């Protein structure tokens, strides 16, 4: 069964596209905007420090000047693939840094990405080293890029469904939770329905492994101490001989250190009565004598206590052997053995729980499936309810973008089995021309039409970030449609910073800030520069974009565009 949202009637063809005054420059975005971009050694850019205004910012320049490099740089800050071919030829590394804030660099948040020709890279947030994934998560909340060909993402049924589900997040999340619970129960039931013999074999194996490890109860840190003790027990005879020899020399021998020191103490008696220095030295010798006697006593204890202990040696060797056996089977380290034992115990507990729960699990699956159908029907109802106003809003913009006869609908078709995203497929059907049947967007829309639909989506649903980048959004359009695209971009810039790479004068003329990308040859090498255009320079650039020259007629046309 296919259910379709109502398609509004086509609007009449407008005689002219009205152009309203753009919002004031630096219109406040919904959050911190991209205020500064620094690029070093990226493609044809050697060094760039670019201050970015708020509102609508346009980047223009001749083909090949390097406009796309700006977008490539921002893509790196979004955690894009590390393409080391972007590093300028002859340089060891590239660096891109973006600052988000009100223009005060000292108080701005920053993100940077460094790539080296050696294949290494680094990402930082406000100076702190982070992973590329952390950089990506941070930047995705601040910057969105609509790449030159990203409009093709609208061809994906999942993305088409996502447009609608952004308006039914509560119902979509409830369905996702219900589906996850149902699938988990189904998976457990399927495990139970597997071969009883195989499950019993697995339980026996896991039980043996858990018992074998638990009986030894290995401690990952015990091997070092055991090896030290093994070395001591294996050399008790040598230890006893060494200690006895020390005792002989210190106190027990015919000529020993204690005796000689004692004689020295006595020899100093006469002089110590009359000289304080001699007395001090005599006292030090007495202390040395006490120390030697104490050491001799301890060595005597060592010698007497170092008798062979074969039982202790056997215990240590047996413990090391047991640990070695476990490492050979479950290692290679004791840490691995302990981890294996924990995982085996967890898996064993799960299998044993499955055995106990076999009687009630089918009932759980049935109940969860019934709940899933209920929640799925609520999701379909919400999608149908929201589809019509969303289509109305999208078509209102699309028709202003030079497609006055455009029609559109979200078609829901029931699935044979519940999917992770719902009980129905969602397909965006579209027609740009009168008399043509609605068809899948992927089959009937041209590249230019896709770009305008994407722009309508961005305007109606809004970008999720305070800064939005459009790379060649104007591909395949001109004339009144170009003016309409400029108007929509200007509207989007009311609440967000909008950065647009464009080749159309109609769009560049509506920008609050106009940047030109130029390519020059310096010292025999191509270098790209970016500068902010104002006054006559901007007028001449608009004229060049219109006519390829700065004739008086082109300049007059440019003045008209800039005047609005």
UniProtKB/Swiss-Prot annotation:
Keyword list, A-Z: ATP-binding, DNA damage, DNA repair, Nucleotide-binding
Listed Low complexity bias regions: 10-20
- Which InterPro entries does this one have? DNA_recomb/repair_RecN, P-loop_NTPase, RecF/RecN/SMC_N
Q: What is this protein called?
A: DNA repair protein RecN
Which GO terms of the molecular function aspect are on file? ATP binding; identical protein binding
Describe its function.
Answer: May be involved in recombinational repair of damaged DNA.
Ranges in coiled-coil conformation: none
Q: Where is this region: Disordered?
A: 1-32
One annotated Gene Ontology cellular component of this protein: bacterial nucleoid
> For ATP, which residues are the binding ones?
61-68
> Short name of one Pfam family for this protein?
SMC_N
**Record family assignment:** Belongs to the RecN family.
Q: Where on the tree of life does the source sit, at the highest rank?
A: Bacteria
Picking any one GO biological process from the record gives:
DNA repair
């Amino acid at each position: 069964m296919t259910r379709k949202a109502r398609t509004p009637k086509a609007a009449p063809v407008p005689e002219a596209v009205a152009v309203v005054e753009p919002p004031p420059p630096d219109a406040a975005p919904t959050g911190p905007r991209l205020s500064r971009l620094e690029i070093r050694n990226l493609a044809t850019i050697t060094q760039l420090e670019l201050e970015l205004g708020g509102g609508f910012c346009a980047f223009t320049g001749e083909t090949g000047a390097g406009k796309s490099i700006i977008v490539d740089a921002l893509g790196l800050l979004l955690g894009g693939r590390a393409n080391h071919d972007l590093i300028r030829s002859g340089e060891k590394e590239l660096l891109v840094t973006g600052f988000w804030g009100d223009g005060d660099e000292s108080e701005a948040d920053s993100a940077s990405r460094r790539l080296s020709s050696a294949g290494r890279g680094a990402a930082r947030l406000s100076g702190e080293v982070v992973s590329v994934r952390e950089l990506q998560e941070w930047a995705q909340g601040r910057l969105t890029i609509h790449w030159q060909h990203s409009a093709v993402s609208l061809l994906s049924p999942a993305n088409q469904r996502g447009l609608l589900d952004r308006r039914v997040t509560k119902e979509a999340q409830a369905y996702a939770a219900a589906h996850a619970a149902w699938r988990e129960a189904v998976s457990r039931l399927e495990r139970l329905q597997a071969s009883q013999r195989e499950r019993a074999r697995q339980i026996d194996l896991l039980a043996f492994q858990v018992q074998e490890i638990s009986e030894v109860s290995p401690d990952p840190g015990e091997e070092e101490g055991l090896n030290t003790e093994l070395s001591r027990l294996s050399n008790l005879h040598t230890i006893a001989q060494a200690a006895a020899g020390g005792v002989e020399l210190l106190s027990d021998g015919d000529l020993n250190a204690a005796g000689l020191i004692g004689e020295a103490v006595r020899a100093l008696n006469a002089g110590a009565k009359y000289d304080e220095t001699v007395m001090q030295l005599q006292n030090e010798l007495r202390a040395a004598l006490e120390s030697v006697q104490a050491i001799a006593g301890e060595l005597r204890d060592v010698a007497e206590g170092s008798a062979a202990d074969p039982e202790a040696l056997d215990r240590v060797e047996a413990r090391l052997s047991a640990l070695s056996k476990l490492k050979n089977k479950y290692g290679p380290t004791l840490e691995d053995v302990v981890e294996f034992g924990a995982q085996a115990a967890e898996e064993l507990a799960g299998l044993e729980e499955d055995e106990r729960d076999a009687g009630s699990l089918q009932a759980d699956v049935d109940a969860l499936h019934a709940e899933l159908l209920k929640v799925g029907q609520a999701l379909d109802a919400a999608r149908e309810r929201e589809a019509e106003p969303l289509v109305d809003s999208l078509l209102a913009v699309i028709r202003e973008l030079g497609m006055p006869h455009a029609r559109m609908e979200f078609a829901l078709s029931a699935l044979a089995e519940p999917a992770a995203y719902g009980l129905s497929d969602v397909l965006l059907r579209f027609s740009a021309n009168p008399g043509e049947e609605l068809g899948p967007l992927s089959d009937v829309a041209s590249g230019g039409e896709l770009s305008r639909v994407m722009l309508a989506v961005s305007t109606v649903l809004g970008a999720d970030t305070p800064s939005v980048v459009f790379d060649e959004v104007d591909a395949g359009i001109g004339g009144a449609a170009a003016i309409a695209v400029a108007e929509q971009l200007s509207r989007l810039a009311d609440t967000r910073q909008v950065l647009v790479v464009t080749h159309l004068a109609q769009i560049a003329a509506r920008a609050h800030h106009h940047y030109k990308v130029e390519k020059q040859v310096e010292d025999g090498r191509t270098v790209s520069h970016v500068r902010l255009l104002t006054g006559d320079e901007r007028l001449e650039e608009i004229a060049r974009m219109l006519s390829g020259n700065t004739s008086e007629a082109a300049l007059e046309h440019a003045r008209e565009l800039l005047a609005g």
